[in-house]
Regions:
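Transmembrane alpha-helix boundary and packing residues in multipass membrane permease domains
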Residues: 38, 42, 53-54, 71, ...
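N-terminal transmembrane alpha-helices
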Residues: 22-54, 58-59, 75-87, 119-123, ...
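Short alpha-helical transmembrane segments in multi-pass integral membrane proteins
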Residues: 1-35, 92-159, 207-266, 322-387, ...
Length: 484
């Protein structure tokens, strides 16, 4: 009894206990309405990706390895689009926090136009140099795996313009506080992907299907359906703050807003592209370790992404919450809420990772029955659980910083940690010392550790708000009118 009383007293004396009611309000009124739909949307996307992997895995180990190699390059491009999407989200959230709907609409419209045109150019270049890209990415993979990876890449690059529209449109809606529409659209899109891809791969009734080609074609068709849905939602004004008519996309560009979006998006995109490029390089390390290791590595990343879903959702929510608070000048509130989201993510993810690690073999069996592949997956998932306590400091904190338009610091930290730790340490341990895929993943965890230390230091010192403080005096200046 004395022990329980002492414990209650310890809890009572903490700062958390004194502010527990305000934290409860924050959780239910601000974090939950944003994070839960984002979590459900991301869960739907990842689960549909898992089901897509199941569909391809039934075609054999080579097919799964081919998709994994092609997707490792596709992730570089998607990371770039997602970074510009982040810039749009922050500008929209900040503009609406200041009750400037017109600026939010113009930022959304111009981001969609510019990134769609860029995606078309990018798809053309990648389609032309596809063979050289796969040779670079696949390393010492077999000829059969390279051929399948090239086929999948050439089909999926056709979906880049649609992916850009869907990502940026969804990001703008989230910035406006509407997370349910992106959830509905992206959820439906991914269900369609499974249905269409399943039919195209394996056929229907007497039609035998297209086999492996159907996987890439189904994804491309589904993405274009999603892009049309996003443009339609914006055109009818489902969210009144972001009503954008189709004819408005042909209006002249406003470069002041473009630079505002790109001021966040470009550092974030440099960070994302360099990060995913480094990850692609580590994928090349794994590519020479055999088909079983390639497949096991691919499956382990898929499972780890599922485990990290709540943290990813909280990171996206922290960007929006921070942008909103700073948009109305509530600096102290933004700082308090970011800390709350960070600790919530850290404790939650650690618990999830440690509880799911004992079932790694069961989860791997949903993807494959190959014992060698399952063995690789089990080892990597246990390692992932061991280092999960530092994940949120590595990823949730910089997401919140970007809501304060502090994107450059995250860019430099990511460059340092990715190339100094993930690539170098991964190569030394995985290749030079012969640790294999475990050494490559240890390089990834070293990357997490460096990021965690530097981002946590920036949070506790308050330096992530310096850029915002410098921009505050400009609020009194009269801004030029923004034409739509």
């Amino acid at each position: 009894m004395n022990i329980s009383s002492a414990l209650r007293q310890v809890v009572h004396d903490t700062r958390w206990h004194a502010k527990r009611k305000s934290y409860k309000v924050l959780f239910w009124r601000e974090i939950t309405p944003l994070a839960v739909p984002i979590f459900m949307e991301n869960a739907c996307v990842l689960l549909m990706g898992v089901l897509s992997t199941f569909l391809v895995s039934w075609l054999g180990k080579d097919a799964m390895a081919g998709v994994g190699l092609a997707d490792s390059f596709n992730m570089v491009i998607m990371a770039f689009f997602a970074a510009i999407d982040l810039g749009t989200t922050v500008v929209v959230a900040f503009s609406l926090g200041k009750r400037d709907r017109r600026r939010a609409r113009v930022a959304t419209r111009q981001s969609l136009v510019i990134m769609t045109l860029f995606a078309v150019l990018l798809a053309t270049l990648i389609h032309h140099f596809g063979e050289q890209i796969i040779d670079f990415v696949a390393g010492d993979a077999t000829t059969e795996v390279k051929a399948l990876a090239l086929t999948y890449l050439e089909l999926t690059v056709l979906s880049y313009p649609a992916a850009a529209i869907t990502l940026i449109g969804s990001g703008a809606l989230r910035g406006a506080g509407n997370t349910k529409i992106p959830l509905l659209i992206n959820g439906s899109l991914n269900i369609l992907n499974i249905i269409i891809s399943g039919i195209l791969i394996y056929g229907l009734f007497s039609w035998p299907g297209l086999g492996f080609v159907g996987a890439g074609l189904g994804l491309t068709i589904s993405r274009y359906i999603g892009a049309v849905a996003i443009l339609w939602v914006l055109a009818i004004g489902f969210n009144p703050a972001l009503r954008i008519s189709l004819k408005s996309y042909f209006k002249p560009l406003n470069f002041s807003i473009i630079w505002e979006v790109m001021g966040i998006g470009i550092p974030a995109s440099v960070e994302s592209v360099l990060f995913t490029s480094g990850r692609l390089l580590t994928q090349m390390f794994v590519a020479g370790m055999g088909t079983s290791v390639i497949a096991g590595n691919f499956i382990a990343f898929s499972i780890a992404a599922l485990i990290n879903l709540p943290g990813s959702a909280l990171g996206s929510a922290s960007t929006i919450i921070t942008g909103r608070r700073l948009g109305v000048g509530q600096i102290a509130q933004a700082e308090i809420q970011l800390r709350h989201v960070f600790w919530l993510s850290t404790l939650g993810l650690t618990a999830i990772a440690w509880l799911t690690a004992p079932f790694a073999g069961v989860m791997a069996s949903f993807y494959t029955q190959d014992p060698q592949v399952k063995h690789v997956v089990v080892i990597l998932i246990w390692l992932n659980a061991l280092f999960m306590p530092i994940w949120s400091a590595s990823w949730v904190l910089p997401a919140g910083f970007k809501g304060a338009r502090d994107a450059r610091y995250a860019m430099w930290v990511s460059m340092l940690s990715m190339w100094g730790c993930r690539v170098v340490v991964g190569y030394v341990l995985g290749i030079m010392l012969g640790w294999g895929v475990v050494g490559v993943w240890m390089g990834m965890f070293a990357d997490w550790a460096v990021r965690a230390v530097l981002f946590y230091w920036r949070m506790v010192t308050g330096r992530w708000l310096w850029k915002y403080h410098r921009s505050e005096p400009q609020k009194c200046e009269k801004k030029p009118a923004v034409s739509e």
